Amino acid sequence: MTPGARPIIGVTGPDRGGGAAWWFTRTAVWLAGGHAVRITPRRPRANMDGVHGLIIGGGADVDPKLYGQELLHVTEKKKRDEPISMWIIGLILFPLTWLMRKLSAVPVTSGQNAARDELEMRLIDDAVRRRLPILGICRGEQLINVYFGGTLLQGLTGLYIEDPEIRTILPRKRIVVESGSCLANVLGPRPVRVNALHRQAIDRLGRGMRVAARDRNGIVQAIEHESLPMIVGVQWHPEYLLQVPQQRALFRALVKPQRRCHVPASEPTGRELVSAA
């Protein structure tokens, strides 16, 4: 890379929709000192040549066939009533959320996108082999886990009992970050509150992966690789929380090598880690 040039960060997304997520992610990468390039099934990259980091963005559910399951038809749990204070905040932020939905063009669905699954699995594999940093966001976190041989919970109904399920773009969900994790090193010691837009989550961890954060109900909110440098997946959407310094730190860790967690260079890479007994 030319001295002084911004690191190139590949950002994956769908062919249709996802405009708001792309715009916010692009802004987050720019604020962190990088330059984002969009990658979609219709605008793919054969490999990670010339790219210095990878963000696997949110979107459609991962095809359950990739982790050995059939598609389950899960009934969504009814959203709980919002307190009046949250209703007022939501009203104030309505113009922003309306704009984001318009930019996204296509409503979020529980469908799959086989072309995107295939593209992103290939890019993750190449990035792992090259020891490039990877940040998975929501679906991206889940796909990273699947890449390493893990499985997903296709629905969360019934898992939010003591603390009802929260679905909001605002940072209302409190999570507990594992002490000594790479994520804790990046986010710092302060309490962490995140947004919640997901309906699936990590079930069985992939090989080499560990839990980096959970919510109060025990649902996995972040994962990371135990030995490979800066492979982190988060269940929330940090690109929509750029007003929060902790969330901007995730993108800085991706862009700036000195901000990352490092491991010895002798560790195995790529599918060696997935196929190892």
What are these model-predicted stretches?
Residues 198:
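Residue(s) in the substrate-gating loop at a strand-loop-helix junction
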Residues 190-193:
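Catalytic cores of DNA base-excision repair glycosylases
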Residues 141:
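The feature captures the ABC ATPase H-loop/switch
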Residues 232-236:
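Active-site-proximal beta-strand elements of phosphoester/diester hydrolases
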Residues 1-137, 145-153, 157-186, 203, ...:
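N-terminal beta1-alpha1 cap of cysteine-dependent amidohydrolase-like domains
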